Amino acid sequence: MLTKIFPVATLLIVFLSSSVYAQDEAAKIDKSRVPAQADSPEKFAPAGWKIEAQISGDLNGDRVPDYALKLVEAKPEKDADGDPTERGRALVIALANNNRLTRAGVADNLLQCTRCGGAFYGVVETPAEVTIEKGVIVVQQDHGSREVTNATYRFRYEPSTGQFLLIGFDLSNTDRATAQVTSESINYLTGAREEMRSKGEKDIKARSVIPRRKIYLDDISADDMESAAYKRLKL
């Protein structure tokens, strides 16, 4: 009888452990559950999500305030030990028109999760900053340990498609032990790229041109963008 109980108990432990682990992982938002239209910003957060930050500003040039909504999973912010939990994030863009808000973009692979900052942030919740500057959506976030990566993305409304186009990308990698900095800045409208490497008190800069291509907020992946930058910078 005991030989029959042990396998069942083992399976139950594995199942419960897997369930707990899945609950601790950051989730990815289901874009299909984000409404196409709503009468208030709060209604763009589907069940299981909430607004972490609400940034307003004119994004399409009609002089009417629009919204960049930073969403986060609606899970407890801290665990039993008082440490921040791992919660996924998403960015929703809503344009205002005739007292209604229309969804204009959802980024599910752009903002880093609340525990994705690495040893650099330790047990402090990892930020993901979103601002609107002169009609441009700016996303800035960093992570790492001894080496810290800082990435900045800039998106601007494209009237012909009704989408938000990546127009600029900056990435820097800083070795905190040696203070050496390697960085690049890309203008996706022109293809102009500038690379900079610090060596002692001297900065070495190089300019080049990359093939122009369109990357939209809905499709962008922060992991892919950073991996490509590391490859270009030979990090």
Segment roles from a protein language model:
Residues M1-I5:
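Positively charged n-region of N-terminal signal peptides that target proteins for export
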Residues P7-S17:
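Bacterial N-terminal signal peptides
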Residues A22-K28, V124-L235:
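Acidic, small-residue rich beta-repeat scaffolds with periodic aromatic anchors
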Residues Q23-A47, N99-G122, Y216:
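Blade-edge motifs of beta-propeller repeat domains
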Residues K50-L59, F120-K134:
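Beta-propeller blade termini
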Residues L59-V72, T131-Q141:
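Acidic/hydrophobic-patterned starts of short beta strands in beta-sheet-rich repeat architectures
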Residues A74-E77, S145-R146:
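Short glycine/acidic-enriched loop and turn motifs that connect beta-strands
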Residues E77-D108, F155-R156:
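Beta-propeller blade repeat segments, especially FG-GAP/WD-type strand-to-loop junctions
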